[in-house]
Amino acid sequence: MATLISGVLETLRIVGDAALNPTLLVLALAFLTYGLPHLIVKFTGSEFIARWIDVFGLKTALKALVTLGIGLVGNQIQNLRASNNWSLFARGSWIWPEEIAVVTGGCNGIGKAIVLALVGKGVRVSVLDVADFPPELAQIGTVFYWKCDISSASAVAAIADSIRETIGHPSILINNAGMANRSSILDLTPEKASELIGVNLISLWYTVKAFLPNMILENKGHIVTMASMSSFISLPTAVDYSALKAGALAFHEGLACEIRHLYKAPGVLTTVAHPMWVDTNMTKGRQEAIERSSGNEMMKPEDVAQVVTDQIFSRRGAQLIIPPSVTWLSAVKGFPNWLQELIRDSIAKTL
């Protein structure tokens, strides 16, 4: 069901993009409105078609489509402004070799790919992780490592002080670290639940509390929250993950609002990313079933990292659905209940 809906909506999107292209529509309307009748006859080969254009209201239809197409472009512009603290233009002056980023969970998977993409632009990166520092990153002179349990407020605060003393104040914070747990609600232990909540959600408060104040002071910064498509749809045996990623989205939305209205720092940007299935340790052992169900190959960590870092380098905030073809899933909670359940049931069969 989910695959069918995705295919239909993607087809409609492609057709709609072409049919509602304002430039093409305006050119077509201009031709029909101002073109001489003999030119219409020349191109169509029929005087009947020239008369039919007026009789059957083709010009009126084109005018309606032009209006709709312009409206869609206006909607896209407003989305861009809203995600960028109501500015259409890139924010601030960023010199990448002078910028410092903090990446939680940066030793593997998406986090590691993000670190490599950042250093490719000259950004100095502080990695916070409980995993060991991988040799591939250790040999890069602009990557620094702190072993850190980000679910501990005191640990994050102490390491934030160390980062500031060692390399300076970070202007980029990427809250990437996450944990998955394949167990049902009844099988989840209180200890594991606390660990998952600490890493996937509560840590967002700790890292932002540590690094946001200087961003506000400078009116410059970018905070990226790595959520998931699970923010929009719950999965069996991953209810904890879905609930916490929904919480991460709520955190991002509230953070962006506080930055604008409480701290009056429009130069501090926020981005939230919602990747679909990615080939990482979290999906190990399920790749074949997921790809069979979705009809697509799973994304690689580098695919997600490219989208996220491109957004950072654009100096604009955003909500990123990765890949864009699954954007429709973000609207599932507005669907009729029966359709929501059919979609959840179809996804559940892959797990």
Describe these PLM feature segments.
Residues S184-I185, T189-S194:
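Substrate-binding pocket helix/loop in short-chain dehydrogenase/reductase
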Residues L80-V125:
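Canonical Rossmann dinucleotide-binding motif of NAD(H)/NADP(H)-dependent dehydrogenases/reductases
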Residues L188, S234-S242:
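Active-site loop-to-helix junction immediately N-terminal to the catalytic Tyr of the SDR YXXXK motif
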Residues N176-N181:
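Conserved NAD(P)H cofactor-binding loop of Rossmann-fold oxidoreductase domains
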Residues S228:
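Residue(s) in the substrate-gating loop at a strand-loop-helix junction
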Residues I259-P324:
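SDR active-site lid
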Residues V208, L244:
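Active-site helix of classical SDR
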